[in-house]
Amino acid sequence: SFEGGRVTMRRTVKSAPQSIWYGEDRPKYLGPFSEQTPSYLTGEFPGDYGWDTAGLSADPETFARNRELEVIHCRWAMLGALGCVFPEILSKNGVTFGEAVWFKAGSQIFSEGGLDYLGNPNLIHAQSILAIWASQVVLMGFVEGYRVGGGPLGEGLDKIYPGGAFDPLGLADDPEAFAELKVKEIKNGRLAMFSMFGFFVQAIVTGKGPIENLSDHIADPVANNAWAYATNFVPGK
């Protein structure tokens, strides 16, 4: 809203969620076989399954910082996982790319003709890895600095769940629905982080993208699985 020529935005609404994913009776990491939950893990925050063997959440300030880092990395991982599989899916369905496999696409910048974004020379044509690196640092640094340091649009808002102009669809308007969405985000984000790790391992071991690896596994599960490729981790083999 506009008040006296200034832009103001609502804060993210906080309330005690009634969802099964919060509170003392929330699902635990080993279900009924879980050990005693640490006293500092009360089920107040999304994604708390009562597991902290290393005691990383014992200090409140460290816990708050780690929660912020986890959510940010979850969001990057979800975007990254989508970026790894989507071009391959499009390529397999007839869409022309210069290179659809995620870990091979960037290497085209070292080729004689450079890199055309989406295989189209009329879009961005990149020839310098240093220019790409500098642009990445500046753009991502600006966005992250704005998020951490705050700015006119984010003043007074939660760093992790700002709401306001950052929630144009109003997904956080209903506190109960918002509490559920937080849980879905952290669960899918953790899965995406593991997926990205798996994509890296696949790239090193098989030299193929995730969709091609999946197709190979479906075609011949016995010959194309983790156990069959395990010897590739042994140096010299």
UniProtKB/Swiss-Prot annotation:
Q: Which Gene3D superfamilies does the annotation name?
A: Chlorophyll a/b binding protein domain
Question: Where on this chain does chlorophyll a 4 bind?
Answer: N188
Residues modified to N2-acetylarginine: R10
GO BP terms = photosynthesis, light harvesting in photosystem I; response to light stimulus
Record-listed chlorophyll a 6 binding positions: H217, A226
Q: How does it sit in the membrane?
A: Multi-pass membrane protein
Q: Where is the signal peptide?
A: none
Its subunit composition reads: The LHC complex consists of chlorophyll a-b binding proteins.
What protein is this chain from?
Chlorophyll a-b binding protein 5, chloroplastic
Query: Per the UniProt entry, what species is this protein from, by scientific name?
Result: Solanum lycopersicum (Tomato)
Q: What is the lineage of its organism?
A: Eukaryota, Viridiplantae, Streptophyta, Embryophyta, Tracheophyta
